[in-house]
């Protein structure tokens, strides 16, 4: 039958984790992302030379699989522990949380290790899935 072709729509954490698992099972995976970059809710945007994270400001890590992945991301320089300073009533102290992490240099850094080696198509919005003569097809601005 040959290698199975699979499209994943969205290059956020879930889409890229799914693509990574499918690629590891010998599927031919293509990820389609409508924006120019990766991350979904972990996206880092740039405007006039300034970068900002419009979604999540940090992640918490509480399950063993995610702990392992964050270790990979930190070794790759894509994530770092975050201990924010808390200011309340004119007093400041470090937050007592050990499981807060940020992406480096921005939050989208966290997903970059997942995207390595994956066929990723950015700037392509998928509008519809259509059953064609050869199977399912994706409808985009450029056609099928």
Please report, for each region that a protein language model flagged, where it lies by residue.
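Beta1/beta-strand and adjacent pyrophosphate-binding region of the FAD-binding site
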Residues: 2-14
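Core beta-strand elements of the Rossmann-like FAD/NAD(P) dinucleotide-binding domain
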Residues: 2-4, 139-144
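Glycine-rich FAD pyrophosphate-binding loop
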Residues: 7-9, 21-47
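A short, Lys/Arg-enriched amphipathic alpha-helix followed by its capping loop at the start of a domain
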Residues: 17-28, 114-118
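N-terminal FAD cofactor-binding segment of flavoenzymes
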Residues: 44-85
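Short beta-strand to alpha-helix junction loop
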Residues: 58-62, 87, 91-113
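A conserved short coil-to-beta-strand element within the FAD-binding core of flavoproteins
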Residues: 122-137
